[in-house]
A protein has these predicted regions:
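Active-site HxH/HxHxD metal-binding segment of metal-dependent hydrolases
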Residues: 52, 70-133, 217-220
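Structural signal for conserved beta-strand scaffold positions within catalytic alpha/beta enzyme cores
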Residues: 42, 85, 107, 121-125, ...
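Short, flexible loop segments at the rims of nucleotide/cofactor-binding pockets, characterized by
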Residues: 42-48, 63-68, 82-85, 134-140, ...
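Short acidic/polar capping segments at secondary-structure boundaries
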Residues: 48, 71-72, 89-90, 110-112, ...
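Short, solvent-exposed secondary-structure boundary motifs
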Residues: 39-51, 112, 116, 129, ...
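Metallo-beta-lactamase
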Residues: 1-8, 15-18, 64-65, 103, ...
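Conserved beta-strand hairpin/beta-sheet module of binuclear metal-dependent hydrolase folds
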Residues: 28-73, 148-164
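N-terminal juxtadomain amphipathic helix
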Residues: 1-46
Length: 224
């Protein structure tokens, strides 16, 4: 998929004897779509592939934009114009979508420098917050140097900055904890200026009010 064959998976550590090719992946897996609302669709690999994650498709008035990318490449999915990343851990099969659909890949400059991103081609490496087709991008650092979250109208895209399990919320442990916490505080100040209804995470979609209550509890626990 990315032009070279590492000795082991950088995420789970599996040896390359257990790898499958991009062609085998496309033959045995597909991308399924689940509606979040009339403008946003959740994208997942089916059956779940490896450390499975969700990407999201946004239908703006101007273009079709993805937030992050599925691990499976499919020629059956509708064309996207851009794929904008929260961070470099969720590049998925984006280079194949870029080649087949001529999709433009956008990522923060700092994450484009990371080892996992070195074999990918990016069309725009942004450094500042921006607003494109009503999609607002906010760089907060933290979990990764270039971590960026997105807001489209009343939908908030957070990826895996925090996880939710057994009713509790936790910060992503992979990354500098102090910077992750500082990024969360910056994010909280931004969120408090928006009216939001849904949160789209790497493996969940939640009502914003429920998610925010857990997020507030997490931030408050830092003060104890």
């Amino acid at each position: 998929m990315i032009g070279y064959y590492p000795e082991h998976c950088p995420f789970c550590g599996a040896l390359n004897v257990n790898f499958i090719t991009a062609e085998e992946c496309s033959e045995n897996y597909k991308v399924i779509e689940t509606e979040v609302n009339d403008k946003v669709i959740r994208l997942n690999s089916s059956p779940p592939l490896g450390l499975e994650h969700s990407a999201y498709c946004i239908e703006t008035k101007n273009q079709t934009v993805w937030i992050d990318c599925p691990s499976v490449f499919s020629k059956d999915i509708e064309r996207m114009d851009k794929i904008m990343f929260t961070h470099h851990h969720f590049l998925g099969a984006s280079n194949l979508y870029r080649s087949y659909y001529s999709a433009f890949l956008w990522i923060h400059e700092e994450d484009s420098k990371q080892n996992l991103a070195q074999k990918y081609s990016f069309d725009k490496k942004f450094e500042n917050d921006y607003n494109l087709f009503d999609i607002k991008a906010y760089h907060i650092n933290g979990h990764t140097p270039g971590f960026t979250f997105y807001i489209f109208k009343d939908i908030f895209f957070i990826c895996d900055y925090v996880s939710v399990s057994s009713g509790n919320m936790h910060f992503n442990p992979y990354g500098p904890r102090d910077k992750t916490i500082e990024g969360a505080k910056v994010m909280n100040n931004i969120l408090n200026k928006h009216e939001l209804r849904k949160v789209c995470g790497f493996d969940y979609v939640l009502d914003y009010s429920d998610w925010k209550a857990k997020f507030d509890d997490l931030l408050n626990s830092l003060k104890i």
